[in-house]
Amino acid sequence: MGKCQVISHPLIQHKLSILRREDTSTKNFRELVNEIAMLMGYEVSRDLPLEDVEIQTPVAKTIQKQLTGKKLAIVPILRAGIGMVDGFLSLVPAAKVGHIGMYRDEETLEPVEYLVKLPEDIDQRQIFVVDPMLATGGSAILAVDSLKKRGAGNIKFVCLVAAPEGVKKLQEAHPDVDIYTAALDEKLNEHGYIVPGLGDAGDRLFGTK
C-alpha cells in the first residue's frame, strides 16, 4: 500500500492557514499555491537518485553529487493543478509538463476526462501528478489510470489538502502510488467538498464561480 505523507513543515502550515481563509484574494491565493507547491517539491523529490561526478572548481578537481539525469514529468489535473506547476518547475526547470483535463459532474460528483496531453516518453519518467485537492479521489484515480494506460509506472500524487475518503480510494485503486499532502482534513460534506478545506481551488485560483 502506498504511503500518505503529511508534510508538516512550519512554512507550509503557515502559508496553508492563510490560503484557507475565505477573505484571501485571488492574487494572494495564486501566489500561496505556488509557494506551497515549491516547498512541497523539496519533500517529494527527496528520494531522487544521485551519482558521483568529477568537476573542476576554481581551485581544484573534486568529486561531487548531482542528479543522475532521471527524467521527470509534472502532470497537473486541470484546471486547478496548473497553479502548482510553476512551484515545481522552479526546482526542476528541465522537467516536462503534461496535462490531464477533467471536470466534476456536479450531480454525480464523478470526474469526466476531456484532455490528455503527455510527453511521448512518459513511460520513462518519474511523474508528479499535482492537484490542490484530493476530495472524493475520482479525479486522481482517473488521472493515474490514464498515465498507466500509457505505460507510466513511477507516479506520486501531490496535493495541498486531502480528505480521508479520497486517500482511501486512491490507495485502494493504486496501492503503488504514494500520496503527499500539506493537510489531511476531517471529511467530505454532502456536496463532495473537503471540510474544513479551502473551497473550490480552481475558482479561487482563477477568480471564477
Swiss-Prot record:
EC number: 2.4.2.9
UniProt entry keywords in alphabetical sequence: Allosteric enzyme, Glycosyltransferase, GTP-binding, Magnesium, Nucleotide-binding, Transferase
Residues bound to 5-phospho-alpha-D-ribose 1-diphosphate: R79, R104, D131, P132, M133, L134, A135, T136, G137, G138, S139, D200
Annotated SUPFAM superfamilies: PRTase-like
A Pfam family assignment: UPRTase
Family from the record: Belongs to the UPRTase family.
Name recorded for this polypeptide: Uracil phosphoribosyltransferase
Gene this protein is translated from: upp
